[in-house]
Design a protein with these regions (language model features):
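Conserved alpha/beta core of the MobA/IspD/sugar-nucleotide pyrophosphorylase nucleotidyltransferase superfamily
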Residues: 2-5, 159, 165-212
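N-terminal glycine-rich phosphate-binding loop and ensuing alpha1 helix
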Residues: 2-57
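Short beta-strand segments
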Residues: 12-14, 53, 102-103, 134-138, ...
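A short acidic, helix-capping loop that chelates divalent metal ions and anchors anionic groups
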Residues: 18-22, 142-143, 192
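Short aromatic/basic micro-patch
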Residues: 28, 108, 151-152, 183, ...
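Conserved N-terminal catalytic core of the sugar/cofactor nucleotidyltransferase
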Residues: 36-100, 112
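Conserved beta-loop-beta/alpha segment of the NTase-like Rossmann-fold superfamily
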Residues: 75-155, 159-162
Length: 212
């Protein structure tokens, strides 16, 4: 049983942005590079540490300019990004009881939502060492919520996160252990939206401006 939660965060920034046409994390969003939104969302004292894992030297330079820890690599798989990020965090913080994985392209995700997820995790982990948390939001009139990232794994899953199948991410474990997955529900489904295309980015940017 864990006495308290010490959680790290891996910012997933290794994608090739093939549908976007260029590195979307560097694309302007509301006057700043898109990745800055992930920096803001994870700038919380509830996280013990965070690191950006990327294959882009430009992203690396951006992180260094903002004082955000970054790991540059050249490996192809999503499993590589997970393994490298978690390993880097544990090298500096071996006491971590959980790790959150967040894609860098969810610009409407708020820090308050990240804090909500971290708080729910900390409360649940007092009772069990094997738990997975993800975000969920209302899906229109359907009975089942939309679900998405970030996803937070307790340290009981770290060994399996280090040995994920080639090219696969942590979602493998959500399918493997459905009874251990908890969903932290939020009111705004747009916080789960990503920006795979320039059109999607423009739509989310318009929503930000509309809300002021």
């Amino acid at each position: 049983m864990q006495m308290h939660a010490s959680t790290g965060c891996v910012l997933m920034a290794s994608g090739l942005s093939t549908r976007f046409g260029s590195n979307k994390l560097l694309a302007p969003f509301d006057g700043q590079p898109l990745l800055y939104r992930a920096f803001a969302a994870t700038d919380t004292p509830q996280l013990s540490a965070r690191i950006v894992v990327t294959r882009s030297a430009q992203v690396q330079a951006l992180c260094k300019a903002q004082g955000v820890p970054v790991l540059l690599h050249a490996l192809p798989g999503r499993n590589d990004t997970v393994r490298l990020g978690l390993s880097a965090l544990l090298a500096q913080h071996p006491e971590l009881t959980g790790c959150m994985f967040l894609p860098g392209d969810q610009p409407l995700l708020r820090r308050a939502t990240v804090d909500q997820l971290l708080t729910a995790f900390a409360q649940t982990q007092k009772e069990t060492e094997r738990v997975i948390f993800r975000l969920g939001a209302p899906a229109g009139n359907g009975p089942d919520p939309l679900v998405g990232s970030p996803v937070l794994f307790s340290n009981g899953f770290f060994p399996e996160l280090f040995t994920l199948p080639e090219g696969k991410g942590g979602s493998v474990l959500l399918h493997k252990y459905p009874t251990l997955v908890h969903t932290a529900c939020i009111a705004q489904p747009e916080e789960l939206a990503d920006t795979d295309t320039p059109a999607a980015l423009a739509q989310l940017e318009a929503l930000v401006r509309e809300k002021g």
